[in-house]
UniProtKB/Swiss-Prot annotation:
Chlorophyll b 3 binds at residues 155, 171. It comes from the Eukaryota. It comes from Zea mays (Maize). One of its GO terms (molecular function) is metal ion binding. This is Chlorophyll a-b binding protein 48, chloroplastic. Photoregulated by reversible phosphorylation of its threonine residues. Chlorophyll b 1 binds at residue 56. PANTHER family: CHLOROPHYLL A/B BINDING PROTEIN (PTHR21649). Chlorophyll a 6 binds at residues 244, 253. The gene is CAB48.
Length: 264
């Protein structure tokens, strides 16, 4: 939207004050700046937004805090610690949550699929997620995906340097405000970062945001479970699932928890 300034240039009024202007606009001023268009609000009938949205305990939920208005995806009206009361803190925490949700979704798939493929006869090296990285310290190094002629890593320092450069470049691009296409929200870049045009329809995009945050929160809990499983059982998630399905009585959280009872 181009910058604009209202002016009256009629020859009949040259040199004369526009008496009606103040009467119409009072003491206000009109300022128009170039900015990215704000996303349209979600449809009023959406169950995930607004004052009548779904709350964390459904009909048993109390009144949500006044600062949780249902404007953002994933707002179920639950904030017992008041973490969202300060707008700046809320904006920061919202960004952190969305980013960690995306990481958890991607990493969760990376923990499951290699082990699943390995158990079904696909040969590409170590399939268990917390053991795969240590292969770089073996004599032959680490090959992706189990083929030395493709990507063959033998130096942990080289991998660390690549991660710093690549991830640093991406984060620097994000923080500095660099963009490919018009940016409406730093968390949802759009433009060249949305080649499928998922954000073109505001109503559909609002629903996709809710799906992302819900699946992301589930993925973060899943990753926490993968970490606990790795520490307690020393096995990957697929093997733990197979063991539980084979013998659910002796392979469950309670059975493993009782192994840590003092004196047992």
């Amino acid at each position: 939207m181009a910058a604009a300034t209202m002016a009256i240039t009629s020859r009949a009024l040259v040199g004369k004050p526009a008496a009606g202007t103040r009467d119409v606009f009072g003491e206000g001023r009109i300022t128009m700046r170039k900015t990215a268009a704000k996303p349209k609000p979600a449809r009023s009938g959406s169950p995930w937004y607004g004052a009548d949205r779904v709350l964390y305990l459904g009909p048993l939920s109390g009144s949500p805090p006044s600062y949780l208005t249902g404007e953002f995806p994933g707002d179920y009206g639950w904030d017992t610690e008041g973490l969202s009361a300060d707008p700046e803190t809320f904006a920061k925490n919202r960004e952190l949550e969305v980013i960690h949700c995306r990481w958890a979704i991607a990493v969760g798939l990376g923990c499951v699929f290699p082990e699943l493929l390995a158990r079904n006869g696909v040969k590409f090296g170590e399939g268990v997620w917390f053991k795969a990285g240590s292969q770089i310290f073996s004599e032959g190094g680490l090959s992706h995906p189990g083929n030395p002629s493709l990507v063959h890593a033998q130096s942990i320092l080289a991998i660390w340097a690549c991660q710093v450069v690549l991830m640093g470049a991406v984060e620097g691009y994000h923080v500095a405000g660099g963009r490919l296409g018009e940016v409406v929200d730093p968390l949802y870049l759009g433009g060249s970062f949305d080649p499928l045009g998922l954000g073109d329809d505001p109503e559909r995009f609002a629903e996709l945001k809710v799906k992302e945050i819900k699946n992301g929160r589930l993925a973060m809990f899943s990753m926490f479970g993968f970490f606990v499983q790795a520490i307690v059982t020393g096995k990957g998630p697929i093997e733990n699932l197979a063991d539980h399905l084979t013998d659910p009585v002796n392979n469950n959280a309670w059975a493993y928890a009782t192994n840590f009872v003092p004196g047992k």
